[in-house]
Regions:
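Residue-level recognition of single "structural anchor" positions
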Residues: 1-205
Length: 205
């Protein structure tokens, strides 16, 4: 099953009524995911003689965030990292963990980066062995949660860094329209949809 067919299958899980054919929605979602502007994706849909506004396309994409649990794995050994995401007049933090095979185990957007937030992130992961960078918030949180903590500069964390690079590259494509002008919930929804699609498509390759 190819990328379009796979995403079409998931579109059908979310939308039971479709004025726009699910396959067209799947193509539109993939174009947007790969960095094509909403304006151009809208023109693509209209060229097919169908109606699909920019806002509708954006909503199709964000609805896929509901399916992120389908790509998340469970593992005792986690490689965890976080990166800064600039939102409306402030910074947020995207946390991502993968297992030893590079498969995602959790993704979480927070307003803070401290021991308290790290404990929330790690306690929801169910992992027992945590490998991170030297961030003090990890070591302290692992100690308080009774988790085994290890520092590693490269290794398993490379898979997380690759995902972050792609996310940052995609966000740069918005120039200054998003996520700098967006609310926390909107940014979180977009990132969860992106991560779902990224790992779904990676699994097809």
């Amino acid at each position: 099953m190819g990328a379009i067919e796979t995403i079409e299958k998931y579109i059908r899980k979310i939308y039971h009524r479709n004025k726009v054919p699910p396959r067209v929605k799947a193509k539109a979602v993939l174009l947007y995911h790969w960095g094509i502007a909403l304006r151009k994706v809208e023109k693509f849909i209209k060229a097919l003689g169908l109606r699909g506004s920019r806002e509708a396309i954006r909503q199709w994409y964000h609805r896929l965030s509901e399916l992120i649990e389908l790509v998340l794995e469970s593992s005792q050994q986690l490689y965890v990292d976080e990166t800064k995401i600039r939102g409306r007049r402030r910074l947020y933090y995207l946390w991502l963990a993968v297992d030893k095979e590079g498969k995602p185990c959790f993704a979480y957007l927070s307003r803070r980066r401290d021991t308290w937030t790290t404990k929330i992130v790690l306690s929801s992961s169910r992992g027992r062995k945590i490998t991170t960078d030297k961030g003090w918030w990890y070591k302290r949180a692992c100690r308080e949660l009774g988790l085994e903590w290890r520092h590693e500069t490269f290794g398993g964390r490379n898979a997380v860094e690759r995902a972050f690079l792609l996310i940052k590259h995609r966000l740069k494509g918005f120039y200054k329209r998003f996520p700098w002008n967006a609310k926390f919930e909107t940014i979180s929804s977009f990132l969860r949809a992106f991560i779902f699609l990224y790992y779904t498509l990676e699994g097809l390759s």
